[in-house]
Every structure is written in C-alpha cells, then in structure tokens.
UniProtKB/Swiss-Prot annotation:
CDD domains listed in its UniProt record: fungal_TF_MHR, GAL4
Name of the protein in question: Transcription factor macR
Biased composition (Polar residues): 104-116, 141-163, 738-752
Protein localization: Nucleus
Pfam families (alphabetical): Fungal_trans, Zn_clus
Organism of origin: Penicillium terrestre
Region called Disordered, residue ranges: 54-122, 138-166, 734-775, 833-853
Cytoplasm is among the record's keywords: no
GO biological process terms held by the UniProt record: DNA-templated transcription
Note: The macrophorins cluster contains a single gene insertion (encoding for the terpene cyclase macJ) compared with the yanuthone cluster that produces the linear compound yanuthone.
GO CC aspect terms: nucleus
Disulfide cysteine pairs (residue numbers): none
Any one GO MF annotation of this record: DNA binding
Length: 853
C-alpha cells in the first residue's frame, strides 16, 4: 500500500465577517459600517478586527500594541462639538500627532507599567474599549479590575435551560442580569412558574446566546464609545461635576456621591492608561454608566449660575453651546442603549435628573406621559417592591428608595397638574420604606479613588432632611389625591383620618426644620446678609451640605420645608371651597381663610428668587404648580371680594410672582436648553410662554381693568415704608382683633392712620410674617346649608376643624417677638434696599396680615 502524501498544513483564514453573522453561521456581505444581514435583522453589527501572529501563525484579536498609531484615525473621526478643544493640547482628542509630555507624578492607584502619561487623558477608541482579555498577558495591567459597584457585576445568564430545584422560589422575583439590568416578575405574569422564575427572563430579553465577554447586543457599543468624543476636557468636566454636587444633588439626592466620584475618577484613570489597560469591570458590565456621566455633566452645566462660567476652567466656553452639545450627547446615549426597552438604574436616574432641564415647564400632558412611562419603567425594575431587594447591598437598597419616592413625588405633581388620579396606587406607598437621614457608604471603593472627605463621612445630611420631608409629604399627598378623586364621595371617617395624618406629618416636618442649622429665621424672611448675598464662586463653603453650621443650603431647606406645610393645608382645604360670593358672609370667611394661606405661601416663596444666594437652586422651583395655584386663588379672591378690605399685601405678592414668571419669557434666555421650534414663538425667537402662565397674566390684567382709578393702589414707596416699618398698616387687622381682647394695644391702633403707600414693608426675601398673638379665627362652619354642598353636618365640622388647623400654619411674627434670642444681632437682615440691622430685636416687626377677618 503506497504511503500517503504528507498532509499540508494550512494557515487559518482571517475572518472578515461580523460577529452576528458568524454566530448565526450565515454568509456576511461585509458591508461597512453594518452588513446587509444585520440591517435586515435589526441587529447591532459589530466587526472584530483580527490579526495573524507571525510567530505562531494563529489568528487573534487585535490588541492596542498591534496598532502603529492612533493618530491615523483622527482624519476619519467626525468633527468635535467643540472644535477649539481639538486644537488644545489638553483636549480629549488633540489634532497633534504626538501626545503631551508625561507627568512627573503618578497616582497611587495608577498602573506603573505605562511609560507615558498625559496631564489630561484622552478617551480611547471603541476598538480598544471592547478588547477581550484573551490576548493579554497575565501580568498586563488593568485599572482596578475589581468592580466599584456596591454589588458584584451582574451574573451571566444561566446556561441551563431548566433551573435546578435548588433555586428556591420567591414570592417577588427580581432578576439581576448582565449590563445592570434588573427586572421584576410578578406572579400574575403568564410566563411565571413558581420555582422556575429564571425562565421568565427569556420572555423579556433576547440575549440568551450573547457571549458573556462581549457587549450586550441591544447596546450599540461602537456608538457609545465613539460618543465619548463629545466629552469636555478633564478640567471642564471636573468643574461641571463640582457644580452638580453643589446645585443639583442636594435637591435630588438620587445618586451615591462616593460611588459616583469613584466611578468618575476611575473612568478618567482608564483614559489616562487606555493604551495598556482595559476599562473597569463595572464599565464593561454596564456601559450605561456613560449615560449617567453625560447626564451629570449636562445637569451641572444647566444649573450652573452665571458666575460659575467665569471659572478658570470654563473661560472661553459659552453656556448655551456647552449645554446644547451635552444635551445632544446625553439623549443620544439613551437611544444607543435603548433605555425604555432595557432600563438600568443608571439610565433611570439619568432620566430623572435631566427631566427638569429637558422638559418645558407647565406642559401637563407631556408631563403626564413622561411620568406614567417612568412609573412603569420603575415598576419593571422592582422599585415598588422592597421585599424583593434582599440580594442587593444596603447602598443599592437606599438609592432605590430615594429613586422610588422621587418618582412618587413626580406622580403627585403630575396628578395635581392634570386633575387625574396618581399612577402609583396606595398599595405601592406602603411597600417601600422611607429613606434614611444619614449618608450611606459603600464597602468596596478602591483606596486610591476615595472621594472628598465631605462626601464619605457618615453623618447627618441636610439634603436628606429635605428629601425626607418632601418624600413623606408626597406619600400623604398621594393618599389625599386618591381619596378626593375617588368615584365615591369623601367620607367623614376617611377624610378625618387624612387630617389627623396631616397634623402628624406637619409635626414631623417641624422636627426636621428644628434639625436644620439656622441663623436668623429664613422661613420668616429674616436671612443674614452674609448668606443672602453669598455666591458659590466666592464662598463655596456656604453651599456645602454641612449640618454643623448655618449655610445657604440650610436656609433654603428651611424655606422649602415650610412651604411643604402650606401645600398640604391648601391641598386639603381647596376642594371644599364654595363658589366665590361676596354677598355670602360664609363664603367670604372661607375664601379669606384660603387666601391667607396662599398669600402666606407666596410671601415665603418670593425669597427663593429674590435672594441672590439661592440662584443655584432656581431651576428646582421653575416648574412647580404650587405658586401658580396660590396666584390663581388669590386673583379670584381679589376679583370677587374687592370691597372686603385692604389687600395690599395680596396684590404685592401676586404682582411680584406674575412679574417674575413673565420676565422669564420676555427675552431669549441664553442659558436655556429648550431650543426646539415648539419652544419658541415667531416674535424674535422668544421662549413661548406656557398656557398656564398666560391665563394668569390675562386674569391679572382683567383685575387691573376692573378696578377704577380711585381703587388702584399707588406704587409702593419702599423707602418710606422702610422708615415706618414698625408702623406698617399690616397691623390693622391685628389691632382690630386685639381690640376685642382684654389688653388692647394702643401702639398698633395708630397704624390705621399710616400713609397708604406704606401698607406693605420691604419684602426682598419675603414680607415679614403674619402676626401671631390673636390670629383670625376660622368660622365654625364653612357652609351655611349642608344640603347645598352635598355634605352632612358632621363632615362640615371636620372641614371647620381643618380651617382652624390651616390658620395655625400662617407664620406668626408674635412668635418671633417671643423668641428674640433666635435672631443674631451682629448680622444684618437682607431687604430690598440693602442690609438692615436687627440689633433692636423687636423693632420693625409687623403685627398682622392685611386681610379682612
């Protein structure tokens, strides 16, 4: 038998097909950037660059070391949003063929092997970012290979089609999968079988056959990493992140600051060593971290006051251009990772943070759709069922609580703006615990990536005190709205229980206010000038979340917590207001009680934009319906009860709020991010005024036209008012009430002869408070005939108790006189015309509210 010829050894071919076609074992057309098969199948087409090893003849993926130069890709890359950054030596993608010189110092956690490091790192290309570790040497460096998440990276899908019986069933099944995906599967789902819960995942995701070392098919990894070219430079990003922590996070603490800071530092550390290291496990496991990064920078740029843009790192940048490009990059990142189909906590938090800056204010139907979608997304992630979170860390559970209650708060705001029932049912209000007051810390932040000390100390947080007050108020408001909008008439027992719960809530809010450090009494309009005139660019320490000393943020927090109390009372009392009728004394009393609440609310609200120090927080209140509701009720009161008495303070508050709202739309706002055609009118590109504000403006003009020249109040003479501050005509009603008491005051009786121009004191940070001692007593019954209102007399008694309780919420200056030590005499109080000493303690305080009793 002849000997066979020697077998010829052939070199393996280089595969030029895309990964999807090779996995499906079909012929690939090799079209760039996407092959025809992937386009037809709607798959994300990904090509893996291969190279032949000359020494072994084997084919392996291309490593960064195999590249001759990264500069060759610069010609093919798209234009940068900031062209001048491309010409800067510190830019993420400099146009120069060589990199900047290395730095002499190397951070403690940086890899020692790279020979070159740059002062401001560049963002690596997509090919470098998705390289598999198969070609790497065992000693090759990897920046912080251990994940910095508060839990281990999501496990890969089980390779077993049928899970073993050892997988114990759970009533609420929470599936934690790759890519940060978390899905809640309820027992009513048609594909749910007890003990086989993991099978339910396959009905929702198409990633069963995805390679565990490759990016998830639903995420356009190439687009995500190419999008990093839109990042600002490291110094610019640092400044925007700092602004985010100053102006955004304290108001919506939906992130864990130490984890965010660690992820941010780790990301830029990888950029600095991208030629020799892979991205962190966290970024590779969940690329949606890029969405969160863009969202944080976008929020920081949008909320930054004008003074912030004078920062050295931001010089030469225009806010409008920077915000626009960051907004585009952020929205693109959400699209590339298919947020609504495959949500993660990163994308959900990003959506919540950017909502106030992306959405136009006072668009109820848009808000309705956005909020309802957000609620459903949160429910698919199991945020409404805390019982299923046992596999998560304590930090993850705390953040999920914050996110859920913030969504409940948004749902309540949307419900009030549309008059519809909330999307979150009452059962969801008891299934998630309330957030804690202290910072919570992760256990596995790398040693070299620790955030600033003020972010890592276990301590009480003023931001969390406000969050707790807001979330607890939202929980009760959701119950009240659901009860009032029920198909059945409100019952006395049910409504009485809500009133009792409201009283308990206000006691809790008072306890929260007492825990906030204070100087002066900000919620009553007395703010020290060093706080009222502060600026974050010159006095950043006054804006820190510091519970040990008075700060600008603590003053803002006390004001906002006080407004929550008034909002609760207005929500309870407003549905039972009778039709306005000046001839009906009971209607007059009921409307006067409500008008007092509204004017008191507006007087406090005016401080939020009249004090310059609060400018970083102005974005938070720009879309709230509370001020508009109070303006509307006050306008109705002024229109139908014109001859009921002096109403100068009410007119002043309404005029100021209307003027402030209209001023926002009088001229194009260079810092506005809402630049779509629907957001502007045809008159010179001005921002289109929302319909709600336009209606209030029309009512305000109609009120002026209905008054005769003799009835219109002349302009306020603030200088003379300030000189006669102690003789303000605001004491008129208090003097009338005290005349019926055993000890009438002779001082306040003289105020009836005060000049008309001095009926309102200066109110730059809010008019001084309503007098306390003898406040107007609400009527014993709001309605004359119970049959006319459809309510029985017992229920009317409950409403009467509600009015009496609501009247007690009006801030009282007599309480201030009883506590002169609360005022700091060596600090000034801001007024419209400047600082005014409060050393006299009792001098210059009003005695009453200018409303008929």
């Amino acid at each position: 038998m002849p000997l066979s010829e020697p077998r010829q050894i052939k070199k393996p071919r280089l595969s030029l097909s895309c990964i999807v076609c090779r996995r499906r074992k079909v012929r690939c057309g090799r079209e760039q950037p996407e092959c025809a098969n992937c386009v037809r199948m709607k798959e994300n087409c990904v090509y893996r660059t291969m190279v032949r090893d000359e020494s072994t003849g084997r084919v392996r993926p291309v490593s960064p070391q195999d590249k001759d130069s990264r500069v060759s890709t610069s010609d093919a890359r798209p234009d940068l949003p900031w062209p001048h950054w491309g010409r800067d030596t510190n830019a993420p993608y400099p146009d120069k063929p060589s990199r900047p010189p290395s730095r002499p110092q190397v951070s403690a956690n940086a890899s020692p092997s790279p020979q070159r490091q740059e002062p401001y790192p560049t963002v690596p290309s997509w090919e470098e970012a998705i390289q598999l570790p198969s070609y790497r040497d065992a000693n090759a460096p990897q920046i912080n290979g251990s994940s910095t998440t508060t839990r281990d990276p999501s496990p890969a899908p089980s390779t077993s089609l049928f899970p073993t019986p050892s997988d114990h069933p759970c009533r609420d099944y929470l599936s934690i999968r790759r890519g940060g995906r978390v899905r809640y599967v309820g027992q009513t789902f048609w594909g749910f079988v007890a003990g086989k819960e993991s099978l339910s995942d396959d009905f929702f995701d198409e990633n069963r056959h995805a390679h565990p070392d490759l990016p998830l098919p639903h995420i356009s990894s190439m687009g995500m990493f190419n999008l990093l070219r839109s990042l600002p430079t490291k110094p610019v990003s640092d400044t925007l992140l700092e602004t985010f922590f100053l102006a955004v996070w304290p108001l919506v603490p939906l992130l864990h600051p130490p984890s965010l800071q660690a992820d941010y530092d780790e990301f830029w550390e990888w950029c600095r060593n991208s030629e020799n290291a892979l991205p962190s496990d966290k970024l590779r496991d969940d690329p949606t971290l890029i969405c969160l990064l863009f969202a944080v920078l976008y929020c920081g740029a949008s909320a930054a006051p004008a003074a912030t843009w004078a920062n050295t790192n931001l010089q030469g940048l225009q806010k409008e251009t920077t915000v626009s490009h960051l907004k585009s990059a952020y929205t693109t990142s959400l699209s590339l990772c298919q947020h609504q189909e495959h949500p993660t906590l990163n994308t959900l938090v990003s959506n919540l943070l950017t909502g106030p800056f992306l959405d136009r204010p006072f668009e109820p139907m848009r808000s309705l759709v956005n909020v309802s979608t957000t609620v459903r997304i949160a429910q698919t992630m199991g945020l409404h069922r805390e019982g299923a979170w046992s596999a998560l860390s304590s930090v993850d559970r705390e953040i999920r609580r914050r996110v859920w209650w913030h969504i409940v708060w948004l749902d309540v705001q949307s419900s009030i703006s549309t008059g519809l029932t909330p999307c979150c049912g009452n059962e969801a209000l008891d299934a998630v615990g309330m957030v804690g007051t202290d910072h919570v810390e992760p256990s596995n932040i790398p040693a070299g990536l620790s955030p600033p000390n003020e972010l890592v100390t276990n301590r009480q947080s003023v931001a969390m005190l406000y969050a707790i007050g807001r979330f607890q108020t939202a929980r009760l408001q959701a119950r009240i709205v659901a009860h009032l909008q029920s198909a059945h008439d409100p019952s006395q027992d049910g409504f009485g229980e809500l009133i009792t719960d409201s009283k308990e809530l206000l006691q809790k809010i008072d306890s929260l206010i007492a825990r906030v450090p204070t100087q002066g009494i900000p919620e009553m309009g007395y703010i020290p000038s060093r706080l009222a005139n502060a600026s974050p660019s010159t006095q950043p320490l006054l804006y820190k979340d510091d519970p040990s000393q008075p700060t600008v943020f603590s003053a803002w927090t006390r004001i906002m917590l006080t407004l929550l109390k008034s909002e609760m009372a207005i929500l309870l009392q407003k549905p039972f207001l009778p039709p306005p009728d000046s001839a009906n004394p009971q209607s007059l009393k009921s409307w006067t009680s409500m008008a007092q609440l509204c004017v008191n609310y507006l007087r406090i609200y005016l401080q939020l934009y009249q004090a310059p120090a609060f400018s970083p927080y102005a974005w938070f209140c720009c879309s709230h319906y509370g001020p508009l509701q109070c303006v509307f009720i006050t306008l109705m009161y002024l229109h139908y009860f014109q001859h009921s008495g002096e109403t100068t303070l009410a007119r002043y508050c309404v005029d100021e709020v209307i003027h402030h709202c209209v001023a926002q739309y009088q001229a194009p706002d260079p810092s506005s991010t809402r630049t779509s055609p629907d957001d502007t009118d045809s008159n010179g590109g001005k921002l289109r005024m929302p319909l709600a504000i336009q209606v209030l403006v029309d009512l305000h003009e109609r009120l002026d036209s209905s008054l005769g020249p003799e009835d219109r109040a002349p302009p306020l003479d603030l200088i003379e008012c300030q000189a006669r501050f102690s003789m303000s005509h605001l004491a008129t009603k208090a003097s009338d009430l005290r005349a019926t008491s055993d000890q009438p005051s002779s001082d306040v009786s003289s105020t009836t002869r005060t000049h008309h121009n001095c009926e309102t004191p200066p109110i730059t940070t809010g008019a001084p408070p309503v007098a306390a001692g003898n406040k107007p007593v609400p009527p014993n019954s709001v309605f004359v005939a119970g049959s006319d209102s459809g309510l029985d007399m017992d229920f009317l008694a409950t409403i009467s108790d509600l009015e009496a309780w609501s009247s007690s919420l009006i801030l009282e200056s007599d309480n201030l006189l009883a506590r002169p030590d609360d005022m700091t005499p060596d600090h000034a109080v801001i007024t419209r015309l400047g600082s005014q000493s409060t050393a006299s303690g009792r001098r210059g305080l009003p005695d009453g509210l200018d409303f008929p009793g």
